[in-house]
C-alpha cells in the first residue's frame, strides 16, 4: 500500500473533524487567536503586526459588537452610515465630521469557526492634509485561552 493511500483515512478523518467542530451561532469559536494586521498608509506598505487575543464566548456570540467601531471621538461627531451583519459577514461604514473629518469602512468575512479575514479602509483629513490607509487582517484560532 502506498504512503498516499495510508494517509487517505487520516485526511478524511481530519476533514470530517474540521467540519464537525461546532460553530458558534455567529461564526467564530471562543479561544486564543493570532491576529496579523498588514497596514498600508497612502499606498506604502508597512510591516505586518501580530498580536494574540483571547476571545471570550461573549465576544464571539456578538461579532457585530466585537468587530464594529465605537462611534465616539473627541472633537468630532461620528455617524454609522452603513451596516450589515450576517452569520458569515460584517460590513460597516462610519463618517466623522469636526476637528477631524474621517471615513472608516470595514468588511469582515468569517470563513470558518477558526478563521476570519478583514479589510479596514480609513480616509481622514486634518488641517488640510488627507491620509488614506488600508489594513488587511487575518485572524486564526490557535487554541484555548491561556
Predicted regions and their residues:
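Bacterial N-terminal signal peptides that target proteins for export
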Residues: 2-12
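N-terminal signal peptide c-region/cleavage motif recognized by signal peptidases
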Residues: 20-22
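A short, structured loop/turn motif at beta-sheet edges
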Residues: 26-29, 57, 82-88, 107-116, ...
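Short beta-strand segments that buttress and anchor functional surface loops
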Residues: 35-38, 91-97, 106, 119-124
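Short, solvent-exposed loop/hinge segments that bridge or flank secondary-structure elements
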Residues: 36-67
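Short, surface-exposed coil-to-beta transition loops
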Residues: 48-49, 100-106, 119-121, 131-136
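Predominantly extracellular/secreted and cell-surface proteins with exposed
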Residues: 56-100
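Edge beta-strand at a domain terminus
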Residues: 124-146
Amino acid at each position: 500500500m502506498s504512503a498516499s493511500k495510508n494517509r487517505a483515512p487520516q485526511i478524511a478523518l481530519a476533514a470530517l473533524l474540521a467540519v464537525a467542530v461546532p460553530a458558534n451561532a455567529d461564526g467564530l469559536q471562543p479561544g486564543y487567536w493570532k491576529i496579523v494586521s498588514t497596514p498600508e498608509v497612502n499606498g506604502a506598505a508597512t510591516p505586518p503586526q501580530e498580536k494574540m487575543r483571547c476571545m471570550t464566548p461573549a465576544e464571539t456570540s456578538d461579532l457585530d459588537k466585537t468587530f464594529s467601531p465605537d462611534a465616539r471621538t473627541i472633537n468630532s461627531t461620528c455617524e454609522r452610515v452603513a451596516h450589515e451583519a450576517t452569520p458569515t459577514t460584517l460590513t460597516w461604514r462610519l463618517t466623522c465630521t469636526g476637528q477631524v473629518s474621517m471615513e472608516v469602512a470595514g468588511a469582515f468575512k468569517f470563513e470558518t469557526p477558526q478563521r476570519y479575514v478583514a479589510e479596514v479602509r480609513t480616509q481622514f483629513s486634518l488641517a488640510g492634509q488627507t491620509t488614506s490607509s488600508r489594513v488587511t487582517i487575518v485572524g486564526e484560532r490557535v487554541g484555548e485561552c491561556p
